[in-house]
Swiss-Prot record:
Protein's name according to its UniProt entry: Large ribosomal subunit protein uL30
A Gene Ontology cellular-component term: ribosome
Family per similarity comment: Belongs to the universal ribosomal protein uL30 family.
Organism encoding this protein: Pseudomonas putida (Arthrobacter siderocapsulatus)
Quaternary assembly: Part of the 50S ribosomal subunit.
Length: 25
């Protein structure tokens, strides 16, 4: 379960970074 939470947080972080980069453009 802990691994799943870590993966989800990692994925959410990537999505947030992607949105930030797109908005930055």
């Amino acid at each position: 379960a802990t691994v799943k939470v870590t993966l989800v947080k990692s994925l959410n972080g990537r999505i947030a970074n992607h949105k930030a980069x797109v908005x930055g453009l």
